[in-house]
From Swiss-Prot:
This is Growth/differentiation factor 8. One of its GO terms (cellular component) is extracellular space. The gene is MSTN. Acts specifically as a negative regulator of skeletal muscle growth. Pfam families: TGF_beta, TGFb_propeptide. Keywords: Cleavage on pair of basic residues, Cytokine, Disulfide bond, Glycoprotein, Growth factor, Secreted, Signal. It is found in: Secreted. InterPro entries: Cystine-knot_cytokine, TGF-b_C, TGF-b_propeptide, TGF-beta-rel, TGFb_CS. It comes from Columba livia (Rock dove).
Amino acid sequence: MQKLAVYVYIYLCMLISVHPLALDDGSQPTENSEKDGLCNACTWRQNTKSSRIEAIKIQILSKLRLEQAPNISRDLIKQPLPKAPPLQELIDLYDVQRDDSSNGSLEDDDYHATTETIITMPTESDFLVQMEGKPKCCFFKFSSKIQYNKVVKAQLWIYLRQVQKPTTVFVQILRLIKPMKDGTRYTGIRSLKLDMNPGTGIWQSIDVKTVLQNWLKQPESNLGIEIKAFDENGRDLAVTFPGPGEDGLNPFLEVRVTDTPKRSRRDFGLDCDEHSTESRCCRYPLTVDFEAFGWDWIIAPKRYKANYCSGECEFVFLQKYPHTHLVHQANPRGSAGPCCTPTKMSPINMLYFNGKEQIIYGKIPAMVVDRCGCS
């Protein structure tokens, strides 16, 4: 697929470059010409920066295959996220971006986001309600991003309430099936025995990869599961419907899928800051703040360093770009000239709510400008 980022930058470069040519032909050089040139450069960079931010908003929605920003209910956003280890690790040790120059060239980057981890919260199973006459946990709906042959890990996380004394807990995960002739409605998925000590409750993970893959291959077989965790006295310790003081302790599925990194080539370019007087093509810093957009459906990062390219590309320096140089030599009036664009970009990792109110952890390619050049 063609790289949208390249076309956006080339278009912006051509559009913005018109500004310096719109001067009055009768204007005369003055002693302030150098100062005016610096002001023009600042205005140019400001226009480029604003256009870059708008382009980023469009690219994120496009790369996540979203027609518009998800309309997530305020109640869901205010609801505490699961307090389990895998999600806390993603948030606490969040790798917003990598400045590793060995990864992520523009040419080798795929366009759409690659999903790495999906956190799926449970819903009530209509089939269970119909059978039992009351809501039961749990039923999981799955994103179309998950393909059965790409699943490398699937863990069901459940929270077990605290115990008052050393206790053996018997955990059983049952899969709901269509009633059989003998009345059987469940089949076992996993059973395990745990020794719990007094104190706070604990999170327990259970491997459900095989079950998930079967559900993905045969969606009609996904009717829900039931979670049981009884102590020696028959007390149910599993939090399935959180009570008072149990916010964020819902069971959930953590699914990890494959993501194959790609090799890239090295390139070099200029780095500048906003006070730089450099006129040549250069990379400038730019921080994108999602909260300023009102994009509260993005959990993390709330902001990231995107950077942008700005500056002049003189033909005298184009020995590195023979094709562009030949075009200009053949038709100097009809050639728009080279444009200062990204020559290397890297991805960002993002934790966000999708349109189905699932929490997705994925990698969005080509969102950070690492190097700029003329092309």
